């Protein structure tokens, strides 16, 4: 049950990011001016009939956020009680600390009237929470645990390949930086600073500049760099590890998601930031990030056979085997 619940928590985090994207895309961040209450009501007692206009998006975001927070609390407790690997338990504690901090940042964002720095930090930390819940879902999955507990034999071919590890890490970090730049663009109002696509004011490079144009163009340049990195990473997997389903599947998914992300980015500009398209662009960017993270984690595990992650004790390994038999 733990793997299923962990996967559900990760999926709910993606829903939360989409809900947050809706708030920003509709300009509803201050539709509810108080926090942690909603117009003086306890969050779960606020009448549905009053959820109209921007209040709908902001209050919905709060409801989803509080639900995800509670789910992560349960996940952290479950890991503490049932997970034999100390480093996985620590991931649960870290996810809990991150989501609490995220909630506080969300409150400060409202109470301080959407300061850019806090809003950007709030958006950026959401991605970290998603990465943590996704990692927990991955390492508690039956396939990961079975292989880790029952086989410590590294893949000889993968052991000789250090390139994939390096480019996968670089790609994941680059995607996160790109998302932070995107959050900066959104929260500083630079989303339409360059109103055409794929050109910039009819040129490859803008002929005039201001801070918002610079931020917007940095996001486009970052998108090009990230796309090349993803193509290199996925291409390396498909050429050198085409027999490894654990690597091929996220590599192919990564190519599909980045193509979709470019399309959504273009449509965001061409549609003048239509809020659904804009929000889909936000959540799809998060999916690109965690897919790259999964590929990175699996590439390390494929090469080291679990050696990169602190080894669990023999008793813990036996515990995992017993649980697999009982399941």
Language-model-derived ranges and their functions:
Residues 176, 180-226, 231:
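Membrane-interfacial catalytic/cofactor-binding modules of polytopic membrane enzymes
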Residues 2-29, 173-186:
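N-terminal signal-anchor transmembrane alpha helix
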Residues 49-71, 210-226:
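Individual transmembrane alpha-helix segments
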Residues 79-93, 158, 234-254, 320:
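Membrane-interface helix-loop-helix junctions at transmembrane boundaries of multi-pass membrane enzymes
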Residues 1-12, 88-95, 160-177, 246-256:
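Interfacial segments of alpha-helical transmembrane regions
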Residues 24-59, 191-213:
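Extracytosolic (periplasmic/ER-lumenal) interhelical loops and adjacent juxtamembrane/interface segments
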Residues 135-149, 163, 167, 291-327:
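A juxtamembrane structural motif centered on a specific transmembrane helix
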Residues 23-32, 100-123, 185-195, 262-286:
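Interfacial helix-loop-helix junctions of multi-pass membrane proteins
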